[in-house]
UniProtKB/Swiss-Prot annotation:
Provenance organism: Klebsiella pneumoniae (strain 342)
Family statement: Belongs to the RecO family.
Family matches, as InterPro entries: ARFGAP/RecO, DNA_rep/recomb_RecO_N, NA-bd_OB-fold, RecO, RecO_C
Protein name: DNA repair protein RecO
Lineage of producing organism: Bacteria, Pseudomonadati, Pseudomonadota, Gammaproteobacteria, Enterobacterales
Intrachain disulfide bonds: none
This protein's record includes keyword Metal-binding: no
């Protein structure tokens, strides 16, 4: 692949004294692994550009699973993520790294990712709606088709007041039992529209995406979730100290 294409760095790590190993999400080639030779050297003009959440144009080539970065240019400054939105962005990056196969094109998902990061950078409230929309988009691109609007058992439209149990590869069927795998018709309509007007529908969306993504993630926990769990108590402690001043 020798042409320029849009890209974001998902993760980077030292590869040698002067080089970086990059996990990159590109518009045309999907997720690729690149060696950025000389990127760690003091004279490199790439060091500042090869950071997560910086829109890039990249050109790379070579054979095998690991390609060589030929050129990279920052299209703009990094999207401004900090605090809870930074941890949310790291979660999205890790999700892509864990779920997408190498060099499989997901051009539409690339723009879903861009919109998610832009939404996180622009929010002054909760990042949850942007995260849930991206997770649902990711599931859709992976071929995880779910009909949220009809009962899998009867084919009837879902009723706001009824409860439905999710069954993998089948969909939602009416249920009299309420547990972690059940959702109201109101929840399912929110999932279908990807609009979450209240805390209850957001929580339901999070439950569903956790269930649906589990087969793709396996038993290995996400590092970003653990970092987020560590961040939240520290954030609360800082807020309490500020309020007590």
């Amino acid at each position: 692949m020798d042409g320029w294409q849009r890209a974001f760095v998902l993760h980077s790590r030292p590869w040698s004294e002067t080089s970086l190993m990059l996990d990159v999400f590109t518009e045309e080639s999907g997720r690729v692994r690149l060696v950025a030779k000389g990127a760690r050297s003091k004279r490199s003009n790439l060091k500042g550009a090869l950071q997560p959440f910086t829109p890039l144009l990249v050109r790379f080539g070579g054979r095998g699973e690991v390609k060589t970065l030929r050129s990279a240019e920052a299209v703009s400054l990094a999207l401004p993520l900090s605090g809870i939105t930074l941890y949310s962005g790291l979660y999205v990056n890790e999700l892509i790294s864990r779920v997408l196969e190498h060099e499989t094109r997901f051009s539409e998902l690339f723009f879903d990712y861009l919109h998610c990061i832009q939404a996180l950078a622009g929010t002054s409230g909760s990042p949850e709606p942007a995260l849930r929309r991206f997770e649902l988009a990711l599931l859709g691109h992976l071929g995880y088709g779910v009909d949220f609007l009809h009962c899998a058992g009867s084919g009837e439209p879902v009723d706001d007041t009824m409860t439905y149990r999710y069954r993998e590869e089948k969909g939602f069927i009416a249920s009299l039992v309420i547990d972690n795998n059940t959702f109201t018709g109101h929840h399912l309509k929110a999932l279908a529209s990807r609009e979450f007007p209240d805390v209850d529908t957001l929580r339901a969306a999070k439950r569903f995406t956790r269930i649906a993504l589990k087969p793709y993630l396996g038993g290995k926990p996400l590092k970003s979730r653990e970092l987020f769990r560590q961040f939240m108590p520290a954030r609360k402690a800082r807020a309490d100290n500020t309020n007590n001043d």
